[in-house]
Amino acid sequence: VNLLFDDYEALLAPGTHHLSTLPNTPVAVNEGIVICEARHSLTNDEKATADELFNALGLSVDVDAKAMPAAGTLSGCGPAFAAIFIEALADGAVRHGVPRVTAYRLASQMLAGTAKLQLATGTHPGAMKDAVCSPGGTTIVGVAALERRGFRSAVMDSIDAIVSK
């Protein structure tokens, strides 16, 4: 995030109405995110129109300027991280005999469905994980393998690395 409200105020003619936004690539299929800086110079009607347009692309979220770098990193870089996760899941399934096209479809739908479930219910992601992890079952074995390899810290570190760039 290079230009925010104050930057545009200095660059644009006085009285120009503007809103800083950061869309991500899934807006191409109306399943994306448009991060909007909470501070703007739009009228209430203009902001309502902008929200309507951006919500048609997926989800529109207003954030304070200080949160723009982290929010933009999460939503803007996240699709690359999700794609790596989909590819890794598919590679694991292919290694065990699932055809690649099928593995990609399964991994992508699983990720999309899980995300939609969390958005629809508001359930804490940890509770969603716990609901799938039966005692002594296969899922908890897989979760333990991810934890041993530092999955969570690797994901968190990727956000830190980008925000501090």
Regions found by a protein language model. Name each.
Residues 1-4:
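ADP-ribose/adenylate-binding Rossmann-like module
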Residues 7, 11-17, 33-70, 82-120:
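Internal alpha-helical scaffold of NAD(P)-dependent oxidoreductase catalytic cores
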Residues 18, 68-73, 125-130:
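Short pre-catalytic strand/loop immediately N-terminal to key active-site residues, enriched for Gly-Thr
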Residues 20-35:
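Active-site capping/gating segments
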Residues 28-32, 70-72, 141:
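A short acidic, helix-capping loop that chelates divalent metal ions and anchors anionic groups
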Residues 77-81, 105-106, 131-134:
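A generic short alpha-helical patch detector that favors 3-5-residue windows
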Residues 108-165:
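NAD(P)-dependent Rossmann-like dehydrogenase/reductase catalytic/cofactor-binding core
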